[in-house]
Amino acid sequence: MSEHERTFVMVKPDGVQRGLIGDIVSRFEDRGLKMVGGKFMQIDQELAEEHYGEHEDKPFFDGLVDFITSGPVFAMVWEGQDATRQVRTMMGETDPAESAPGTIRGDYGLDLGRNVIHGSDHEDEGANEREIELFFDEAELVDWDQIDSSWLYE
């Protein structure tokens, strides 16, 4: 059996402005993932710089910070078997032009800078915990029993 885990996902300002929150949430629910936290918010400069800190020395850092602070986002925590890998697969490639149809970025992404969604990197050990703690207090995460989980997981 695969690992049951939590993962961080964020609908970026372009996805919020285009009214895509509901569709994105539905896709993850349809996949059998369970939302345990959700927050509609405006990211400030300090949080943006901390969130993208790994890219601080890169030429695109200022653009990332400017974009993610340009409008509201919808931050979420999803739970399920291999949740991070499932979410990353459903999101598609970072560049929408390289994303398959049927993925979130393949269907809705416009370009590399406007790719609708962010998800924790499954190859970065600790990325989930770091991002979840950055955006959510423990009290904002809800442990609940999904009634159909016995149908989803062995």
From Swiss-Prot:
One function term, GO molecular function aspect: ATP binding
Active site annotation, chain numbering: 118 (pros-phosphohistidine intermediate)
Main location: cytoplasm
Keyword match Nucleus: no
Gene Ontology BP term (one): UTP biosynthetic process
Family affiliation: Belongs to the NDK family.
Protein's name according to its UniProt entry: Nucleoside diphosphate kinase
Gene name for this UniProt entry: ndk
